[in-house]
Amino acid sequence: MNLSFFDQFSSPHLLGHPLILLSLLLPALLFPSPGNRWINNRLSTIQLWLLHLITKQLMIPLNKNGHKWALMLTSLMTMLLTINLLGLLPYTFTPTTQLSMNMALAFPLWLATLLTGLRNKPSASLAHLLPEGTPTPLIPALILIETTSLLIRPLALGVRLTANLTAGHLLIQLISTASIALKPILPTVSILTMAILLLLTILEVAVAMIQAYVFVLLLSLYLQENI
């Protein structure tokens, strides 16, 4: 049976039940279980160091009030990073290639930052819709443009993550298919294609990490504007 290249992005089912919930819960197995000691082993040490580094980078643009969001933003980045990397393994499913999931993450968090600004400093939040020193004739047009720019932020967050991961998975699928097809005909070209596939896989690992960081970093910058 011939399958479409996009079939890899469909949610797998087992006995009629979607496995996306299982794929979201499996990354929790990678985290250390709580024990009597602060640090149980070397793996825990590395994980704590990475979590500290991530939290420090995300909290740099925020003031003291924004530090309340540290746990949620760090947890979100850890989840996205783990899911993106696990999705590169063979015969796995990447939930973050689904626009519905990414929008479900982006829209509520963006709305939370917006409502936080409207509650804490409404005048400053509304002032972002009109740049300082705008000529009077341009005020209506600029307010409309800034409002549109504000409203498409969650869409840009979700589409950016979906598009980057989908494009990478499609390239890996296409090059691996070409490598297998060329093996009996042109073995040398097939080997070169496999080398390109290896380099592309390394690049996709970097993209998976960068996109998780960019998603959460943009949320922290939106939060900075409203705190």
From Swiss-Prot:
What keyword terms does UniProt attach to this protein? ATP synthesis, CF(0), Hydrogen ion transport, Ion transport, Membrane, Mitochondrion, Mitochondrion inner membrane, Transmembrane, Transmembrane helix, Transport
Give the catalysed reaction(s), semicolon-separated. H(+)(in) = H(+)(out)
GO molecular function list: proton channel activity; proton-transporting ATP synthase activity, rotational mechanism
Membrane-spanning residues where? 14-34, 69-89, 98-118, 139-159, 167-187, 190-210
Which Pfam families does the protein's record reference? ATP-synt_A
Q: Which N-terminal stretch is annotated as signal sequence?
A: none
Q: What's its membrane topology?
A: Multi-pass membrane protein
> What name appears for this protein in its UniProt entry?
ATP synthase F(0) complex subunit a
